A protein has these predicted regions:
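Active-site nucleophile-adjacent alpha helix/oxyanion-hole segment immediately C-terminal to the catalytic cysteine
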Residues: 1-42, 48, 53, 57-60, ...
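Extracellular and analogous surface-interaction loops
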Residues: 21, 68-72, 136
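Conserved active-site-adjacent core of cysteine acyl-enzyme catalytic domains
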Residues: 33-93, 98-126
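Charged phosphate-binding loop/patch that engages nucleotide di/tri-phosphates or the phosphate backbone
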Residues: 124-140
Length: 140
């Protein structure tokens, strides 16, 4: 899976969905905007519903939020909430994608300022919870 760099300061949710959907940021941004989802809307990084709505547009199923127990307990494909904190009593976080494939695990982090968007520095990331995601197969 390939990383997608967020083109807006607060577009990590959109970029994470773009990576999962195999599309680029601008296309995911257009889809999000058509659904009434915008990167500067605080709900995008303080609620899961906007990301869930965008995932549904791309036929990607999302499970419930599950507190992180360990990296090894994560499903093979998941959204993670890192940099979780509270501001004024409201939770905020940075969306990233966890991938386990071909005997390798990594995190796709869309933050533009990073030197690499494929991360394996698991000790530095502190996920609060994960959401299992999977592509819905078309019926044929």
């Amino acid at each position: 899976m390939k990383p997608v760099v967020q083109l807006e300061r607060t577009g990590c949710g959109i970029a994470s969905v773009a990576a999962l959907a195999g599309t680029n940021y601008r296309q995911a941004q257009r889809s999000a905007n058509q659904l009434g989802i915008f990167a500067d809307d605080r709900r995008l990084w303080s609620e899961t519903q906007p990301v869930r709505t965008l995932l549904k547009r791309y036929r990607i199923r999302a499970g419930t939020e599950i507190p992180l127990v360990s990296w090894s307990a994560l499903p093979d494909l998941a959204l993670l909430a890192i940099k979780w904190h509270r501001e004024g009593g409201r939770a905020f976080w940075h969306w990233v994608v966890f991938v386990r494939e071909h005997d390798r695990s990594y995190v796709l982090d869309s933050k533009r300022a990073l030197n690499t968007h494929v991360r394996t520095d698991f000790g530095r990331m502190r996920p609060k919870w994960s959401i299992r995601v999977e592509k819905i197969r078309s019926r044929r």
